[in-house]
């Protein structure tokens, strides 16, 4: 298999693997901890703490009954758009852009599965900084944030590569 085909296959399989890791970690948390319980690992700095997020990032719209439907619709639309650009970036051999889009796609799909299946997103990764608790998140959130930062960096520092895809 030549390098381009190998990279294309890898970039297209990456979201599947990341979604699997996301869903398996959520399954572990749900079956290990009761809601709003967890376990600290590093001197009460890092812990797993099971929560159910009915909103979006940082629980935005969590208190709105219609919020889950709006978020699900927006997430589905964005996932489709990201996937279209992912396929296009692979076709033009822009693997750095494709990698960032794969991360974004995995993040969107991982949380979308939860929203459709459970009507909330399982969050569990928690960091405490003294009295401040950073908003609790999951593997899909990590993928989405890394993909977003990577895409912004590409657009700022390698604009010609991004232009080939858009």
List the predicted regions and their residue ranges.
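Alpha-helical transmembrane bundles and membrane-interface segments of multipass inner-membrane proteins
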Residues: 1-166
């Amino acid at each position: 298999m030549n390098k381009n085909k190998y990279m294309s296959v890898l970039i297209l399989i990456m979201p599947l693997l990341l979604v699997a890791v996301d869903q398996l970690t959520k399954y572990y948390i749900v079956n290990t901890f009761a809601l709003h319980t967890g376990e600290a690992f590093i001197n009460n700095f890092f812990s797993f703490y099971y929560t159910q997020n009915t909103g979006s990032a940082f629980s935005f719209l969590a208190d709105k009954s219609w919020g889950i439907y709006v978020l699900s619709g927006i997430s589905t639309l964005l996932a489709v758009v990201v996937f279209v650009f992912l396929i296009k970036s692979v076709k033009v051999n822009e693997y750095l852009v494709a990698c960032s889009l794969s991360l974004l796609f995995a993040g969107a799909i991982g949380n979308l599965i939860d929203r459709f299946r459970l009507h909330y997103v399982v969050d569990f990764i928690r960091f405490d900084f003294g009295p401040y608790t950073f908003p609790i998140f999951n593997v899909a959130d990590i993928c989405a944030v890394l993909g977003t930062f990577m895409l912004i960096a590409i657009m700022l520092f390698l604009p010609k590569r991004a232009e080939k895809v858009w």
